[in-house]
Protein backbone atom coordinates (compact mmCIF):
# COMPACT_ATOMS: atom_id res chain seq x y z
CA UNK A 1 0.00 0.00 0.00
CA UNK A 2 2.72 2.50 1.00
CA UNK A 3 4.72 1.61 -2.10
CA UNK A 4 1.69 2.29 -4.30
CA UNK A 5 1.19 5.70 -2.66
CA UNK A 6 4.87 6.55 -3.21
CA UNK A 7 4.86 5.94 -6.97
CA UNK A 8 3.09 9.17 -8.00
CA UNK A 9 5.51 11.19 -5.85
CA UNK A 10 8.50 9.43 -7.42
CA UNK A 11 7.20 10.17 -10.91
CA UNK A 12 7.01 13.83 -9.92
CA UNK A 13 10.21 14.25 -7.94
CA UNK A 14 12.39 11.32 -8.95
CA UNK A 15 13.46 8.40 -6.82
CA UNK A 16 16.34 6.53 -5.34
CA UNK A 17 17.63 3.93 -7.76
CA UNK A 18 17.07 0.40 -6.55
CA UNK A 19 19.86 -1.07 -4.48
CA UNK A 20 22.03 2.02 -4.00
CA UNK A 21 21.00 4.41 -1.26
CA UNK A 22 23.24 7.16 -2.65
CA UNK A 23 21.94 7.01 -6.24
CA UNK A 24 18.93 9.11 -7.26
CA UNK A 25 17.21 9.24 -10.64
CA UNK A 26 14.29 10.53 -12.65
CA UNK A 27 13.86 7.78 -15.22
CA UNK A 28 12.26 9.58 -18.17
CA UNK A 29 10.46 12.88 -18.71
CA UNK A 30 9.28 14.79 -21.80
CA UNK A 31 10.73 17.99 -23.20
CA UNK A 32 9.71 19.94 -26.31
CA UNK A 33 12.01 17.94 -28.58
CA UNK A 34 11.91 14.45 -27.07
CA UNK A 35 12.63 12.92 -23.67
CA UNK A 36 15.29 13.27 -20.99
CA UNK A 37 16.64 11.18 -18.12
CA UNK A 38 18.65 12.34 -15.10
CA UNK A 39 20.65 10.53 -12.40
CA UNK A 40 23.04 11.46 -9.60
CA UNK A 41 25.23 9.40 -7.30
CA UNK A 42 26.80 10.91 -4.20
CA UNK A 43 30.34 10.15 -3.03
CA UNK A 44 31.27 13.17 -0.89
CA UNK A 45 29.97 13.72 2.64
CA UNK A 46 28.04 16.67 1.20
CA UNK A 47 26.97 16.35 -2.42
CA UNK A 48 29.04 18.86 -4.41
CA UNK A 49 27.34 18.15 -7.77
CA UNK A 50 24.10 19.94 -8.58
CA UNK A 51 22.01 19.44 -11.71
CA UNK A 52 18.72 20.61 -13.19
CA UNK A 53 16.49 20.60 -16.26
CA UNK A 54 13.77 23.13 -17.06
CA UNK A 55 11.39 22.79 -19.98
CA UNK A 56 8.73 24.78 -21.79
CA UNK A 57 6.89 24.38 -25.07
CA UNK A 58 9.67 26.25 -26.88
CA UNK A 59 12.92 25.67 -24.97
CA UNK A 60 14.87 23.21 -22.83
CA UNK A 61 17.61 24.24 -20.37
CA UNK A 62 20.08 21.70 -18.94
CA UNK A 63 22.59 22.43 -16.17
CA UNK A 64 25.34 20.35 -14.52
CA UNK A 65 27.37 22.11 -11.81
CA UNK A 66 30.33 20.25 -10.32
CA UNK A 67 31.44 21.97 -7.12
CA UNK A 68 34.77 21.76 -5.34
CA UNK A 69 35.83 22.84 -1.87
CA UNK A 70 32.23 22.42 -0.75
CA UNK A 71 28.70 22.59 -2.23
CA UNK A 72 28.08 26.31 -1.76
CA UNK A 73 29.12 27.49 -5.24
CA UNK A 74 27.32 24.75 -7.16
CA UNK A 75 24.15 25.33 -5.12
CA UNK A 76 24.43 29.06 -5.78
CA UNK A 77 24.72 28.48 -9.54
CA UNK A 78 21.78 26.07 -9.34
CA UNK A 79 19.64 28.85 -7.87
CA UNK A 80 20.76 31.81 -9.98
CA UNK A 81 22.05 30.96 -13.46
CA UNK A 82 18.82 29.88 -15.19
CA UNK A 83 16.80 32.83 -13.83
CA UNK A 84 19.48 35.17 -15.18
CA UNK A 85 19.44 33.43 -18.57
CA UNK A 86 15.66 33.72 -18.71
CA UNK A 87 15.71 37.38 -17.62
CA UNK A 88 18.32 38.43 -20.18
CA UNK A 89 16.71 36.36 -22.95
CA UNK A 90 13.44 38.26 -22.41
CA UNK A 91 15.26 41.59 -22.37
CA UNK A 92 17.20 40.86 -25.57
CA UNK A 93 14.48 39.15 -27.58
CA UNK A 94 15.64 35.57 -27.21
CA UNK A 95 18.55 33.33 -26.37
CA UNK A 96 21.98 34.20 -27.77
CA UNK A 97 25.69 33.87 -27.02
CA UNK A 98 25.67 37.35 -25.48
CA UNK A 99 22.72 36.44 -23.25
CA UNK A 100 24.52 33.35 -21.97
CA UNK A 101 27.76 35.25 -21.37
CA UNK A 102 25.87 37.94 -19.50
CA UNK A 103 24.13 35.34 -17.30
CA UNK A 104 27.46 33.67 -16.46
CA UNK A 105 29.04 37.06 -15.68
CA UNK A 106 26.17 38.13 -13.43
CA UNK A 107 26.23 34.80 -11.57
CA UNK A 108 29.98 35.07 -11.03
CA UNK A 109 29.80 38.66 -9.82
CA UNK A 110 26.93 37.96 -7.45
CA UNK A 111 28.71 34.94 -5.98
CA UNK A 112 31.94 36.92 -5.53
CA UNK A 113 29.94 39.65 -3.81
CA UNK A 114 28.44 37.11 -1.43
CA UNK A 115 31.92 35.74 -0.66
CA UNK A 116 33.19 39.23 0.14
CA UNK A 117 30.27 39.92 2.47
CA UNK A 118 30.67 36.60 4.27
CA UNK A 119 34.47 36.80 4.59
CA UNK A 120 34.54 37.90 8.28
CA UNK A 121 32.37 34.93 9.31
CA UNK A 122 33.24 32.33 6.64
CA UNK A 123 36.63 33.07 5.04
CA UNK A 124 36.69 29.53 3.61
CA UNK A 125 34.00 30.63 1.13
CA UNK A 126 36.77 32.27 -0.91
CA UNK A 127 38.13 28.79 -1.70
CA UNK A 128 34.82 27.32 -2.90
CA UNK A 129 34.06 27.05 -6.62
CA UNK A 130 32.10 25.17 -9.25
CA UNK A 131 32.46 23.98 -12.81
CA UNK A 132 29.43 24.96 -14.86
CA UNK A 133 28.02 23.15 -17.92
CA UNK A 134 24.85 24.46 -19.58
CA UNK A 135 22.90 23.30 -22.60
CA UNK A 136 19.99 25.19 -24.12
CA UNK A 137 17.78 24.12 -27.03
CA UNK A 138 15.53 26.70 -28.67
CA UNK A 139 14.07 26.70 -32.19
CA UNK A 140 16.22 23.71 -33.21
CA UNK A 141 19.35 25.61 -32.17
CA UNK A 142 21.66 24.14 -29.54
CA UNK A 143 23.84 26.25 -27.25
CA UNK A 144 26.48 24.62 -25.04
CA UNK A 145 28.45 26.73 -22.56
CA UNK A 146 30.93 25.53 -20.00
CA UNK A 147 33.50 26.39 -17.38
CA UNK A 148 35.73 23.57 -16.12
CA UNK A 149 35.78 19.91 -17.09
CA UNK A 150 32.18 18.74 -17.09
CA UNK A 151 31.37 17.60 -20.60
CA UNK A 152 28.65 17.57 -23.24
CA UNK A 153 28.75 14.85 -25.91
CA UNK A 154 26.48 14.49 -28.94
CA UNK A 155 25.50 11.10 -30.33
CA UNK A 156 24.62 11.22 -34.02
CA UNK A 157 24.58 9.01 -37.09
CA UNK A 158 26.26 9.63 -40.40
CA UNK A 159 23.69 10.81 -42.92
CA UNK A 160 22.13 7.85 -44.73
CA UNK A 161 23.44 5.23 -42.27
CA UNK A 162 21.09 3.14 -40.09
CA UNK A 163 21.40 4.26 -36.44
CA UNK A 164 21.26 0.61 -35.35
CA UNK A 165 24.71 0.19 -36.88
CA UNK A 166 26.29 2.71 -34.55
CA UNK A 167 26.58 6.37 -33.69
CA UNK A 168 29.39 8.91 -33.75
CA UNK A 169 30.42 10.63 -30.52
CA UNK A 170 31.16 14.34 -30.87
CA UNK A 171 32.44 16.33 -27.91
CA UNK A 172 30.73 19.72 -27.86
CA UNK A 173 32.40 21.26 -24.81
CA UNK A 174 35.98 22.23 -24.05
CA UNK A 175 37.75 20.70 -21.04
CA UNK A 176 39.27 23.61 -19.09
CA UNK A 177 41.70 21.39 -17.22
CA UNK A 178 45.47 21.90 -17.03
CA UNK A 179 45.93 18.18 -17.71
CA UNK A 180 45.39 19.36 -21.31
CA UNK A 181 48.60 20.83 -22.72
CA UNK A 182 46.81 23.63 -24.59
CA UNK A 183 45.12 24.73 -21.35
CA UNK A 184 48.46 24.76 -19.49
CA UNK A 185 49.90 26.96 -22.24
CA UNK A 186 46.91 29.29 -21.98
CA UNK A 187 47.30 29.68 -18.21
CA UNK A 188 51.07 30.24 -18.49
CA UNK A 189 50.58 32.82 -21.25
CA UNK A 190 48.25 34.79 -18.97
CA UNK A 191 50.82 34.63 -16.14
CA UNK A 192 54.23 34.91 -17.88
CA UNK A 193 56.06 36.19 -14.81
CA UNK A 194 54.87 33.43 -12.44
CA UNK A 195 57.01 30.30 -12.70
CA UNK A 196 54.77 28.58 -10.12
CA UNK A 197 51.48 29.17 -11.91
CA UNK A 198 51.17 25.51 -13.00
CA UNK A 199 52.83 22.76 -10.99
CA UNK A 200 52.93 18.98 -11.29
CA UNK A 201 51.89 17.74 -7.85
CA UNK A 202 50.39 14.48 -6.55
CA UNK A 203 50.53 12.94 -10.02
CA UNK A 204 48.64 15.67 -11.92
CA UNK A 205 49.07 19.22 -13.19
CA UNK A 206 47.47 21.87 -10.96
CA UNK A 207 47.18 25.66 -10.97
CA UNK A 208 49.38 26.91 -8.11
CA UNK A 209 49.67 23.26 -7.11
CA UNK A 210 46.03 23.33 -5.94
CA UNK A 211 43.35 22.97 -8.60
CA UNK A 212 43.11 21.26 -11.99
CA UNK A 213 40.42 23.35 -13.69
CA UNK A 214 41.28 26.76 -15.14
CA UNK A 215 37.77 28.24 -15.37
CA UNK A 216 34.95 28.23 -12.83
CA UNK A 217 32.36 30.15 -10.88
CA UNK A 218 33.92 31.15 -7.56
CA UNK A 219 37.47 30.21 -6.45
CA UNK A 220 37.78 33.87 -5.57
CA UNK A 221 41.16 33.46 -3.84
CA UNK A 222 42.67 32.38 -7.18
CA UNK A 223 41.03 35.20 -9.15
CA UNK A 224 41.40 38.28 -6.97
CA UNK A 225 44.98 39.07 -5.83
CA UNK A 226 43.69 41.39 -3.09
CA UNK A 227 42.55 38.38 -1.07
CA UNK A 228 46.19 37.49 -0.46
CA UNK A 229 46.59 40.79 1.40
CA UNK A 230 43.31 40.65 3.30
CA UNK A 231 44.08 40.31 7.06
CA UNK A 232 41.02 38.13 7.71
CA UNK A 233 41.85 35.72 4.89
CA UNK A 234 45.50 35.65 5.95
CA UNK A 235 44.51 34.59 9.45
CA UNK A 236 41.76 32.11 8.63
CA UNK A 237 41.94 31.30 4.93
CA UNK A 238 44.49 29.91 2.54
CA UNK A 239 46.31 32.95 1.08
CA UNK A 240 47.96 32.36 -2.30
CA UNK A 241 50.31 35.04 -3.65
CA UNK A 242 49.03 36.28 -7.03
CA UNK A 243 50.04 39.09 -9.35
CA UNK A 244 46.95 38.64 -11.51
CA UNK A 245 44.00 36.19 -11.73
CA UNK A 246 45.07 32.55 -12.09
CA UNK A 247 41.57 31.47 -13.18
CA UNK A 248 38.69 33.02 -15.14
CA UNK A 249 34.91 32.72 -15.43
CA UNK A 250 34.79 33.22 -19.22
CA UNK A 251 32.72 30.35 -20.67
CA UNK A 252 33.46 28.50 -23.89
CA UNK A 253 30.28 28.55 -25.99
CA UNK A 254 29.31 26.68 -29.14
CA UNK A 255 26.18 27.18 -31.24
CA UNK A 256 24.86 24.73 -33.82
CA UNK A 257 21.68 23.92 -35.67
CA UNK A 258 20.35 20.49 -34.78
CA UNK A 259 20.12 18.05 -37.68
CA UNK A 260 17.90 14.99 -38.25
CA UNK A 261 20.89 12.68 -37.68
CA UNK A 262 21.50 14.12 -34.18
CA UNK A 263 20.08 11.51 -31.79
CA UNK A 264 20.86 12.53 -28.21
CA UNK A 265 23.04 14.62 -25.91
CA UNK A 266 24.89 13.50 -22.79
CA UNK A 267 25.68 16.15 -20.17
CA UNK A 268 27.77 14.91 -17.23
CA UNK A 269 30.21 15.97 -14.55
CA UNK A 270 33.78 14.73 -14.81
CA UNK A 271 33.00 11.92 -12.36
CA UNK A 272 31.46 10.06 -15.32
CA UNK A 273 34.17 10.86 -17.87
CA UNK A 274 36.88 9.74 -15.45
CA UNK A 275 35.66 6.19 -16.06
CA UNK A 276 33.89 6.22 -19.46
CA UNK A 277 35.11 7.48 -22.81
CA UNK A 278 32.86 9.64 -24.98
CA UNK A 279 32.47 6.72 -27.40
CA UNK A 280 31.56 4.20 -24.69
CA UNK A 281 28.91 6.51 -23.23
CA UNK A 282 27.33 7.09 -26.65
CA UNK A 283 27.31 3.36 -27.37
CA UNK A 284 25.55 2.63 -24.07
CA UNK A 285 22.83 5.19 -24.77
CA UNK A 286 22.36 3.96 -28.33
CA UNK A 287 22.00 0.28 -27.40
CA UNK A 288 19.68 0.49 -24.38
CA UNK A 289 16.10 1.59 -23.67
CA UNK A 290 15.46 5.22 -22.82
CA UNK A 291 13.87 4.67 -19.43
CA UNK A 292 16.54 4.95 -16.75
CA UNK A 293 19.35 5.55 -19.27
CA UNK A 294 21.09 8.17 -17.10
CA UNK A 295 21.21 5.71 -14.21
CA UNK A 296 22.60 3.08 -16.58
CA UNK A 297 25.49 5.41 -17.46
CA UNK A 298 26.16 6.10 -13.78
CA UNK A 299 26.18 2.38 -13.04
CA UNK A 300 28.58 1.72 -15.93
CA UNK A 301 30.97 4.30 -14.47
CA UNK A 302 30.67 2.77 -10.99
CA UNK A 303 31.37 -0.69 -12.38
CA UNK A 304 34.56 0.67 -13.97
CA UNK A 305 35.52 2.36 -10.70
CA UNK A 306 35.03 -0.95 -8.89
CA UNK A 307 37.17 -2.85 -11.42
CA UNK A 308 40.04 -0.43 -10.87
CA UNK A 309 40.02 -1.42 -7.19
CA UNK A 310 39.48 -5.12 -7.95
CA UNK A 311 36.02 -4.87 -6.44
CA UNK A 312 32.47 -5.52 -7.58
CA UNK A 313 29.76 -2.93 -8.11
CA UNK A 314 27.85 -4.50 -5.23
CA UNK A 315 30.76 -3.68 -2.92
CA UNK A 316 30.79 -0.02 -4.00
CA UNK A 317 27.08 0.31 -3.18
CA UNK A 318 27.74 -0.65 0.44
CA UNK A 319 30.28 2.12 1.06
CA UNK A 320 29.05 5.18 2.97
CA UNK A 321 29.24 8.71 1.59
CA UNK A 322 32.48 10.45 2.48
CA UNK A 323 34.45 7.21 2.50
CA UNK A 324 33.05 6.50 -0.94
CA UNK A 325 34.92 9.54 -2.33
CA UNK A 326 38.10 7.43 -2.19
CA UNK A 327 36.59 5.19 -4.89
CA UNK A 328 34.75 7.62 -7.15
CA UNK A 329 33.58 11.23 -7.36
CA UNK A 330 30.04 12.58 -7.25
CA UNK A 331 28.52 11.84 -10.67
CA UNK A 332 25.69 13.71 -12.40
CA UNK A 333 24.30 12.64 -15.78
CA UNK A 334 21.54 14.09 -17.96
CA UNK A 335 20.65 12.42 -21.27
CA UNK A 336 18.51 14.48 -23.66
CA UNK A 337 16.95 12.71 -26.65
CA UNK A 338 16.52 14.74 -29.84
CA UNK A 339 13.41 13.57 -31.67
CA UNK A 340 13.13 15.88 -34.66
CA UNK A 341 9.51 14.85 -35.32
CA UNK A 342 8.55 16.10 -31.84
CA UNK A 343 9.69 19.65 -32.40
CA UNK A 344 6.54 20.63 -34.30
CA UNK A 345 4.24 23.08 -32.55
CA UNK A 346 1.47 20.51 -32.12
CA UNK A 347 3.74 18.21 -30.12
CA UNK A 348 5.65 20.87 -28.20
CA UNK A 349 2.40 22.32 -26.84
CA UNK A 350 1.88 19.05 -24.97
CA UNK A 351 4.99 19.72 -22.85
CA UNK A 352 4.14 21.59 -19.67
CA UNK A 353 6.38 24.28 -18.25
CA UNK A 354 8.39 22.64 -15.53
CA UNK A 355 11.41 20.46 -15.03
CA UNK A 356 13.38 18.94 -12.23
CA UNK A 357 16.18 19.84 -9.85
CA UNK A 358 18.22 16.97 -8.44
CA UNK A 359 18.40 16.74 -4.64
CA UNK A 360 20.89 19.03 -2.89
CA UNK A 361 21.95 15.91 -1.01
CA UNK A 362 20.90 12.34 -1.83
CA UNK A 363 20.43 11.62 1.87
CA UNK A 364 17.43 14.00 1.76
CA UNK A 365 15.61 11.36 -0.36
CA UNK A 366 13.93 13.90 -2.63
CA UNK A 367 14.59 17.02 -4.66
CA UNK A 368 14.20 20.38 -2.95
CA UNK A 369 10.53 20.89 -3.79
CA UNK A 370 10.31 24.42 -2.40
CA UNK A 371 13.41 25.45 -4.34
CA UNK A 372 12.00 23.90 -7.50
CA UNK A 373 8.77 25.89 -7.12
CA UNK A 374 10.78 29.08 -6.55
CA UNK A 375 12.78 28.58 -9.75
CA UNK A 376 9.66 27.79 -11.76
CA UNK A 377 8.04 31.00 -10.52
CA UNK A 378 11.11 32.98 -11.61
CA UNK A 379 11.40 31.29 -15.00
CA UNK A 380 7.72 31.26 -15.90
From Swiss-Prot:
SUPFAM superfamilies: PP2C-like. Disruption phenotype: Plants missing PP2C42/PP2C-D2, PP2C64/PP2C-D5, PP2C79/PP2C-D7, PP2C63/PP2C-D8 and PP2C68/PP2C-D9 exhibit an increased hypocotyl length, as well as an enhanced sensitivity to LiCl and media acidification. Binds 2 magnesium or manganese ions per subunit. GO terms for molecular function: metal ion binding; protein serine/threonine phosphatase activity. It is an enzyme of class 3 (hydrolase). It comes from the Eukaryota. SMART domains: PP2Cc. Its EC number is 3.1.3.16. InterPro entries: PP2C, PP2C_BS, PPM-type-like_dom_sf, PPM-type_phosphatase-like_dom. Mn(2+) 2 binds at residues 66, 270, 329. It catalyses: O-phospho-L-seryl-[protein] + H2O = L-seryl-[protein] + phosphate; O-phospho-L-threonyl-[protein] + H2O = L-threonyl-[protein] + phosphate. Pfam families: PP2C. Keywords: Hydrolase, Magnesium, Manganese, Metal-binding, Protein phosphatase. PROSITE patterns: PPM_1 (PS01032), PPM_2 (PS51746). Mn(2+) 1 binds at residues 66-67. Its cofactor is Mg(2+); Mn(2+). Residues 35-338 form the PPM-type phosphatase domain. May dephosphorylate and repress plasma membrane H(+)-ATPases (PM H(+)-ATPases, e.g. AHA1 and AHA2), thus influencing negatively plant growth and fitness. Belongs to the PP2C family. This is Probable protein phosphatase 2C 63.
